[in-house]
A protein has these predicted regions:
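Single-stranded nucleic acid-binding surfaces, predominantly the OB-fold ssDNA-binding core
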Residues: 2-7, 12-235
Length: 235
Protein backbone atom coordinates (compact mmCIF):
# COMPACT_ATOMS: atom_id res chain seq x y z
CA UNK A 1 0.00 0.00 0.00
CA UNK A 2 1.28 3.47 -0.80
CA UNK A 3 0.13 6.98 -0.04
CA UNK A 4 -0.70 9.74 -2.46
CA UNK A 5 1.02 13.08 -1.89
CA UNK A 6 -0.33 16.13 -3.68
CA UNK A 7 0.94 19.71 -3.57
CA UNK A 8 -1.96 22.17 -3.50
CA UNK A 9 -2.25 24.45 -6.53
CA UNK A 10 -2.70 28.20 -6.29
CA UNK A 11 -6.21 29.53 -6.98
CA UNK A 12 -5.09 32.58 -8.93
CA UNK A 13 -4.20 32.32 -12.62
CA UNK A 14 -0.61 33.52 -12.21
CA UNK A 15 0.00 31.13 -9.34
CA UNK A 16 -1.63 28.28 -11.27
CA UNK A 17 0.68 28.92 -14.23
CA UNK A 18 3.74 28.95 -11.97
CA UNK A 19 2.67 25.72 -10.29
CA UNK A 20 2.02 24.03 -13.65
CA UNK A 21 5.49 25.06 -14.84
CA UNK A 22 7.07 23.66 -11.68
CA UNK A 23 5.14 20.41 -11.98
CA UNK A 24 6.24 20.00 -15.60
CA UNK A 25 9.84 20.64 -14.54
CA UNK A 26 9.69 17.87 -11.93
CA UNK A 27 9.32 15.13 -14.57
CA UNK A 28 11.60 15.46 -17.59
CA UNK A 29 12.47 12.74 -20.09
CA UNK A 30 14.48 12.65 -23.31
CA UNK A 31 14.68 9.46 -25.36
CA UNK A 32 16.27 9.07 -28.79
CA UNK A 33 16.21 5.98 -30.92
CA UNK A 34 14.84 3.99 -33.82
CA UNK A 35 11.10 3.68 -34.32
CA UNK A 36 10.36 -0.07 -34.22
CA UNK A 37 6.55 -0.16 -34.45
CA UNK A 38 3.64 1.53 -36.15
CA UNK A 39 1.19 3.64 -34.15
CA UNK A 40 -1.59 1.90 -32.23
CA UNK A 41 -4.63 3.73 -30.86
CA UNK A 42 -4.65 4.35 -27.10
CA UNK A 43 -7.48 6.75 -26.18
CA UNK A 44 -9.12 10.09 -26.88
CA UNK A 45 -9.56 13.16 -24.65
CA UNK A 46 -11.76 16.10 -25.72
CA UNK A 47 -11.49 15.05 -29.36
CA UNK A 48 -7.69 14.65 -29.30
CA UNK A 49 -6.49 11.13 -30.13
CA UNK A 50 -3.43 9.58 -28.49
CA UNK A 51 -1.40 6.75 -29.98
CA UNK A 52 1.40 4.44 -28.81
CA UNK A 53 4.67 3.81 -30.63
CA UNK A 54 7.84 1.94 -29.56
CA UNK A 55 11.32 3.49 -29.61
CA UNK A 56 14.49 1.36 -29.44
CA UNK A 57 17.09 3.07 -27.23
CA UNK A 58 20.58 1.56 -27.25
CA UNK A 59 22.71 1.22 -24.12
CA UNK A 60 26.47 1.66 -23.84
CA UNK A 61 26.71 -2.12 -23.43
CA UNK A 62 25.26 -2.64 -26.96
CA UNK A 63 22.03 -3.99 -25.47
CA UNK A 64 18.88 -1.89 -25.80
CA UNK A 65 15.55 -0.92 -24.27
CA UNK A 66 12.21 -0.74 -26.07
CA UNK A 67 10.43 2.32 -24.66
CA UNK A 68 6.68 2.89 -25.23
CA UNK A 69 5.88 6.48 -26.19
CA UNK A 70 2.42 8.10 -26.20
CA UNK A 71 2.01 10.67 -28.97
CA UNK A 72 -0.86 13.04 -29.78
CA UNK A 73 -2.24 12.93 -33.31
CA UNK A 74 -1.58 16.69 -33.32
CA UNK A 75 2.19 16.16 -33.08
CA UNK A 76 2.64 13.62 -35.88
CA UNK A 77 0.70 12.01 -38.72
CA UNK A 78 -0.13 8.81 -36.85
CA UNK A 79 -1.47 7.14 -40.01
CA UNK A 80 2.04 7.05 -41.51
CA UNK A 81 4.76 4.49 -40.77
CA UNK A 82 8.08 5.75 -39.42
CA UNK A 83 9.63 2.33 -38.75
CA UNK A 84 13.42 2.52 -39.12
CA UNK A 85 13.55 6.31 -38.72
CA UNK A 86 15.33 8.00 -35.80
CA UNK A 87 13.18 10.00 -33.40
CA UNK A 88 13.98 12.31 -30.48
CA UNK A 89 11.22 12.66 -27.88
CA UNK A 90 11.02 15.15 -25.01
CA UNK A 91 8.29 14.63 -22.45
CA UNK A 92 7.33 13.04 -19.14
CA UNK A 93 7.28 9.50 -17.71
CA UNK A 94 3.68 8.77 -16.77
CA UNK A 95 1.71 5.96 -15.17
CA UNK A 96 -1.86 4.75 -14.97
CA UNK A 97 -3.56 1.76 -13.38
CA UNK A 98 -5.03 -0.83 -15.74
CA UNK A 99 -7.46 -3.26 -14.18
CA UNK A 100 -6.83 -6.88 -15.16
CA UNK A 101 -7.13 -10.30 -13.54
CA UNK A 102 -8.93 -8.76 -10.55
CA UNK A 103 -5.86 -6.58 -9.91
CA UNK A 104 -4.59 -3.15 -10.86
CA UNK A 105 -1.47 -3.20 -13.01
CA UNK A 106 0.77 -0.12 -13.22
CA UNK A 107 1.32 0.80 -16.88
CA UNK A 108 4.15 3.21 -17.74
CA UNK A 109 5.00 5.17 -20.89
CA UNK A 110 6.72 8.35 -22.05
CA UNK A 111 4.17 11.10 -22.75
CA UNK A 112 5.56 13.10 -25.69
CA UNK A 113 5.47 16.90 -25.51
CA UNK A 114 7.90 17.44 -28.41
CA UNK A 115 9.04 15.07 -31.16
CA UNK A 116 11.55 15.57 -33.94
CA UNK A 117 13.28 13.33 -36.46
CA UNK A 118 17.07 13.23 -36.44
CA UNK A 119 19.52 12.20 -39.15
CA UNK A 120 21.88 10.11 -37.05
CA UNK A 121 22.70 9.11 -33.50
CA UNK A 122 25.92 10.58 -32.18
CA UNK A 123 27.79 8.29 -29.80
CA UNK A 124 28.08 11.08 -27.25
CA UNK A 125 24.34 11.76 -27.30
CA UNK A 126 22.32 11.18 -24.17
CA UNK A 127 19.85 8.84 -25.81
CA UNK A 128 17.89 8.02 -22.68
CA UNK A 129 17.76 10.32 -19.66
CA UNK A 130 15.22 11.20 -17.00
CA UNK A 131 14.95 13.60 -14.07
CA UNK A 132 12.26 13.18 -11.40
CA UNK A 133 11.42 15.27 -8.34
CA UNK A 134 8.86 13.49 -6.19
CA UNK A 135 7.99 11.84 -2.90
CA UNK A 136 8.75 8.41 -1.47
CA UNK A 137 5.34 6.74 -1.22
CA UNK A 138 6.30 3.19 -0.22
CA UNK A 139 8.95 1.83 2.14
CA UNK A 140 12.16 1.15 0.15
CA UNK A 141 13.02 -2.52 -0.34
CA UNK A 142 16.74 -3.34 -0.07
CA UNK A 143 18.12 -6.71 -1.12
CA UNK A 144 21.10 -8.51 -2.61
CA UNK A 145 21.02 -10.50 -5.84
CA UNK A 146 22.33 -14.10 -5.92
CA UNK A 147 25.57 -12.64 -7.31
CA UNK A 148 25.86 -10.26 -4.36
CA UNK A 149 24.82 -7.05 -6.12
CA UNK A 150 23.05 -4.54 -3.86
CA UNK A 151 19.67 -3.25 -5.04
CA UNK A 152 17.00 -0.98 -3.55
CA UNK A 153 13.52 -0.54 -5.04
CA UNK A 154 11.75 2.81 -4.63
CA UNK A 155 8.28 3.97 -5.63
CA UNK A 156 8.24 7.71 -6.33
CA UNK A 157 5.04 9.79 -6.49
CA UNK A 158 5.58 12.64 -8.95
CA UNK A 159 2.95 15.39 -8.97
CA UNK A 160 1.11 16.46 -12.09
CA UNK A 161 -1.14 19.53 -12.50
CA UNK A 162 -4.70 19.41 -11.15
CA UNK A 163 -4.07 17.01 -8.30
CA UNK A 164 -2.86 14.01 -10.29
CA UNK A 165 0.30 11.99 -9.61
CA UNK A 166 2.43 9.49 -11.48
CA UNK A 167 3.85 6.52 -9.58
CA UNK A 168 7.29 5.63 -10.92
CA UNK A 169 9.22 2.48 -9.87
CA UNK A 170 12.94 3.19 -9.48
CA UNK A 171 15.85 0.82 -8.92
CA UNK A 172 19.09 1.88 -7.17
CA UNK A 173 22.42 0.07 -7.22
CA UNK A 174 25.43 -0.28 -4.90
CA UNK A 175 26.11 2.81 -2.76
CA UNK A 176 22.88 4.41 -3.97
CA UNK A 177 20.96 1.33 -2.81
CA UNK A 178 22.48 1.51 0.68
CA UNK A 179 21.68 5.23 0.83
CA UNK A 180 18.08 4.81 -0.40
CA UNK A 181 17.38 1.94 2.01
CA UNK A 182 16.89 4.47 4.82
CA UNK A 183 14.51 6.84 3.00
CA UNK A 184 11.17 7.40 4.75
CA UNK A 185 7.68 7.58 3.26
CA UNK A 186 6.81 11.23 2.56
CA UNK A 187 10.40 12.42 2.04
CA UNK A 188 11.05 14.43 -1.10
CA UNK A 189 13.64 12.98 -3.44
CA UNK A 190 15.32 14.00 -6.71
CA UNK A 191 16.41 11.26 -9.09
CA UNK A 192 18.52 11.22 -12.26
CA UNK A 193 18.82 8.14 -14.42
CA UNK A 194 17.49 6.29 -17.46
CA UNK A 195 14.35 4.34 -18.34
CA UNK A 196 14.95 0.64 -18.72
CA UNK A 197 12.82 -2.27 -19.88
CA UNK A 198 13.12 -5.64 -18.16
CA UNK A 199 11.59 -8.94 -19.19
CA UNK A 200 10.15 -11.25 -16.55
CA UNK A 201 7.95 -14.34 -16.39
CA UNK A 202 4.48 -13.92 -14.83
CA UNK A 203 2.97 -17.09 -13.35
CA UNK A 204 -0.70 -17.19 -14.37
CA UNK A 205 -1.56 -20.49 -12.71
CA UNK A 206 0.09 -23.80 -11.85
CA UNK A 207 0.67 -24.66 -15.51
CA UNK A 208 0.98 -21.39 -17.40
CA UNK A 209 3.50 -18.56 -17.39
CA UNK A 210 3.57 -15.45 -19.56
CA UNK A 211 6.51 -13.30 -20.63
CA UNK A 212 5.97 -9.65 -19.69
CA UNK A 213 8.00 -6.45 -19.77
CA UNK A 214 8.39 -4.10 -16.80
CA UNK A 215 9.57 -0.51 -17.07
CA UNK A 216 11.46 1.32 -14.34
CA UNK A 217 14.02 4.06 -13.79
CA UNK A 218 17.58 2.86 -13.34
CA UNK A 219 19.01 5.45 -10.94
CA UNK A 220 22.48 6.91 -11.49
CA UNK A 221 22.17 9.74 -8.93
CA UNK A 222 19.69 10.64 -6.20
CA UNK A 223 19.39 13.00 -3.27
CA UNK A 224 16.91 13.93 -0.59
CA UNK A 225 15.68 17.51 -0.87
CA UNK A 226 15.65 19.64 2.26
CA UNK A 227 12.44 20.96 3.81
CA UNK A 228 13.40 24.52 2.83
CA UNK A 229 13.44 23.47 -0.82
CA UNK A 230 10.08 21.75 -0.40
CA UNK A 231 8.51 24.91 1.02
CA UNK A 232 10.02 27.01 -1.76
CA UNK A 233 8.40 24.79 -4.41
CA UNK A 234 4.96 25.15 -2.80
CA UNK A 235 5.02 28.96 -2.47
Amino acid sequence: QYIKIVVEESEDVEGRTKMTDKVIENNQVTVMGEVVSNFSYSHEIYGEGFYMVDIKCTRLSDSFDIIPVMVSERLLDVTASYVGMLLCVNGQFRSYNRHEERKNRLVLSVFAREVKFIEEMEESSKTNQIYLDGYICKEPVYRKTPLGREIADLLLAVNRPYGKSDYIPCICWGRNARYAEHFKVGERCAIWGRIQSREYMKKLDEEHVEKRVAFEVSVSKLELLEEAQVQESIV
